[in-house]
């Protein structure tokens, strides 16, 4: 809390807050809980369209899938905790987002995990990766929720640090929807789940400041302890309770613990709450009321129910072996009062906890873009560099640790443009997350637009009509003027791109103060998207013998932030621009081509450019190709720029020759560049050979990720 905020609180109360009140206020006024630095900009984001049932403001967003099915979706970061204790930090990140979905009345059905680390040459970064992946895998597998996709990327700005973002979707019937706030006084507050301990105390305040060099020792107690077995019981018990129709409001205890859950539940519609902190079941002896109120012990939920329904709901919890207690009630008066063994230990106006004033920091624009001459290296050397990049390698090592098939809904599995989950006999839900900090670092506005465009392309590539978005904004300290400016520009880019596609953000997360000892991370907006797809229309992904290969979209000289430049250590360049008109037209064209059954396979072009997209399709289809890159619709005649530019709006399509004329009619920029077949990848330029590689060699490199961790495949 800043000195001017402490002064404001003293003036409002007319006195000094006592120890319990001060601890609760510190938690609720933290950046992590209050969004005080980000709220002024977040209101720019579009939050409504015909698919949105519930936009931002509760624990998760809700999207209409059809008349009988709604989808709850949310995204969270657990960056600081995972950097300090990677296993526990990542595991509790999964637990938290699953409970966010659960408390809307939805059954969690899938997770995505966009995760980022420093260079793998360093042992500490390998330790963080292995711990985070094991934490996500163990927790997700044990609660029976599949992890179906995500990103695993590496960047020098994350040395000794990690970004762990987790998105979750759940499925629900409209009649089971429960709000996270109350609409009447007199309700009893029932706490259920794990006992409360000292873990996670000041978790939100720790997440609202940069990490020190000794964070691993100093901040370990701020990381919560995961217990997936209790979470599994909590999922089933919560849904059974919700299905009775007698749960009036429901929140999980995440950041800020009991203070945050109960004050937000009561305060949203102007009610108050009385909490009897000494009734909370404790895991450790001699805990103080302060510790009880701000503990972030995991696997706990807070239910608001009418007095006459308490016993019925309680019996459900007992059936699952879960401990439950009435810890308070909702009152008419808008105050937040805490008792401890009969003594009043806190008494605050509830809006002092829930309505935190915003802060607008100084902004300072910067520009890192500058024209850079394309390097004069051979095509073969450039391809080897990019194809062997840790960001391009197949992450099978990661996703094979996750049970991605539990619940039996996963139709399109990890490793494709987007995962697809079966919702009913005819339709599936496509789910994907994307971000490109290298583009955002060069130009935060266009980097953010690009993240939205890539999500749309990934959804469209599996035949899905995009429905809605969620965003996770990972930034360094907002107190740095350049960082705050890049945040504002990012939100502007996210808003403009979503509006152009007619999409809305239904939930999101902001994580500031991602820096270690004065070293800020790059701006890293991560966007996750949902789409609806007809299951029998999903195209393939790999090449097939004898089929034509086409490129949709125009390639520009846009190598700034590209994988090629990163591998060569080149700074600057121009970040790719999104031509919204072309991006939309191409997405609509691809969807129409899929609807008509014109395409056998589709892959969007993104990281690594056309060269990488083609090689990935060859490896997946176990089929070679011959492709003349001089035929690609492009504004440059440099083979390296055509092959490795990361221009937006582009797709590789694979189709039988008889469909060519129909496809040509759908796109402004379209060309056949070659044919699939044989056992090698052959790149040409004006008929001359640039590179020839056997598929076996391509696969050997592509599957070599475990070697970077010192493991054999």
UniProtKB/Swiss-Prot annotation:
Annotated InterPro entries: PRibForGlyAmidine_synth_PurL, PurL_linker, PurM-like_C_dom, PurM-like_C_sf, PurM-like_N, PurM-like_N_sf
Any one GO MF annotation of this record: ATP binding
SUPFAM superfamilies reported for this sequence: PurM C-terminal domain-like (SSF56042), PurM N-terminal domain-like (SSF55326)
GO terms under cellular component: cytoplasm
Cysteine disulfide partners in this protein: none
Binding locations of substrate: 77-80, 99, 224, 296-298, 511
Source taxon at top rank: Archaea
Subcellular location: Cytoplasm
Positions of Mg(2+) 1 binding: 76, 509
Keyword flag DNA repair: no
NCBIfam families: FGAM_synth_II (TIGR01736), PRK01213.1 (NF002290)
Similarity comment: family membership: Belongs to the FGAMS family.
Protein's name in the database: Phosphoribosylformylglycinamidine synthase subunit PurL
Organism: Thermococcus kodakarensis (strain ATCC BAA-918 / JCM 12380 / KOD1) (Pyrococcus kodakaraensis (strain KOD1))
Lineage: Archaea, Methanobacteriati, Methanobacteriota, Thermococci, Thermococcales
